[in-house]
Amino acid sequence: MELLCHEVDPVRRAVRDRNLLRDDRVLQNLLTIEERYLPQCSYFKCVQKDIQPYMRRMVATWMLEVCEEQKCEEEVFPLAMNYLDRFLAGVPTPKSHLQLLGAVCMFLASKLKETSPLTAEKLCIYTDNSIKPQELLEWELVVLGKLKWNLAAVTPHDFIEHILRKLPQQREKLSLIRKHAQTFIALCATDFKFAMYPPSMIATGSVGAAICGLQQDEEVSSLTCDALTELLAKITNTDVDCLKACQEQIEAVLLNSLQQYRQDQRDGSKSEDELDQASTPTDVRDIDL
């Protein structure tokens, strides 16, 4: 007799409020306040002496993997990276505390966006218990103080629905465009070059890159890529040339990510072949632990 219950309760979500999406004042208010929540400087040059850009990329990749494995809301990861960048822009931080800071930022973002937020204990497990729950809770107060409790930051996800509503797209294609745009937004959050970009530009560039990419495989828009870029720039009051440059950078980040993934796959296959040929290492000192 099987007593284990395999039923999974579906996530209950509120319907999108059409009154908010149809009111242009909401979009204008987002555009007005978005820059309040950007990092104040490129902190690698003037604030951080111990942390390098590649370290941020590593902790960002780890944070993204945690959010994906825990099936967090799409907004959690970009919001956590916003907290991390704003903190690092004002507080010199030793590299030994970077993962702790990343865990705290996920902890705060999930509290704001999740119905069942990540727990301190679970986040500590993801650090291989290199930090303790009490340490995470103490740093939570430190980060909150440095951010002045301004946690409701505007992120690219806040613009997605407003942008999609104004595009002449087939309704059945919107979910696919939305999914691709969300992927681009997550990729942008892992790359520091986008940290100083307004969220509206990242959102607009991500939607444009998603539609133009899908356009190569199937008809998802009646507009050409150039006409689409001009329309997107008009929606968010963005300079067309700046938007084109942003979209090209997003596409370059995607290409680099795909190439890295393929390289990792090849390296993995090569390692498996080598293990098959020699089941024991020829020199124990060559093993990097």
UniProtKB/Swiss-Prot annotation:
Residues 264-289 are annotated as: Disordered. Its main location: nucleus. Belongs to the cyclin family. Cyclin D subfamily. Phosphorylation at Thr-280 by MAP kinases is required for ubiquitination and degradation by the DCX(AMBRA1) complex. It comes from the Eukaryota. This is G1/S-specific cyclin-D2. Signal peptide: none annotated. Pfam families: Cyclin_C, Cyclin_N. Residues 26-151 form the Cyclin N-terminal domain. One of its GO terms (cellular component) is nucleolus. Keywords: Cell cycle, Cell division, Cyclin, Cytoplasm, Disease variant, Membrane, Nucleus, Phosphoprotein, Ubl conjugation. Interacts with either CDK4 or CDK6 protein kinase to form a serine/threonine kinase holoenzyme complex. The cyclin subunit imparts substrate specificity to the complex. The modification Phosphothreonine is found at residue 280. It is found in: Nucleus; Cytoplasm; Nucleus membrane. The modification Phosphoserine is found at residue 271. Regulatory component of the cyclin D2-CDK4 (DC) complex that phosphorylates and inhibits members of the retinoblastoma (RB) protein family including RB1 and regulates the cell-cycle during G(1)/S transition. Phosphorylation of RB1 allows dissociation of the transcription factor E2F from the RB/E2F complex and the subsequent transcription of E2F target genes which are responsible for the progression through the G(1) phase. Hypophosphorylates RB1 in early G(1) phase. Cyclin D-CDK4 complexes are major integrators of various mitogenenic and antimitogenic signals. It is linked to Megalencephaly-polymicrogyria-polydactyly-hydrocephalus syndrome 3: A syndrome characterized by megalencephaly, ventriculomegaly that may lead to hydrocephalus, and polymicrogyria; polydactyly may also be seen. There is considerable phenotypic similarity between this disorder and the megalencephaly-capillary malformation syndrome. Disulfide bonds: none annotated. One of its GO terms (biological process) is G1/S transition of mitotic cell cycle. Coiled coil: none annotated. InterPro entries: Cyclin, Cyclin-like_dom, Cyclin-like_sf, Cyclin_C-dom, Cyclin_N, Cyclins_cyclin-box. One of its GO terms (molecular function) is cyclin-dependent protein serine/threonine kinase regulator activity.
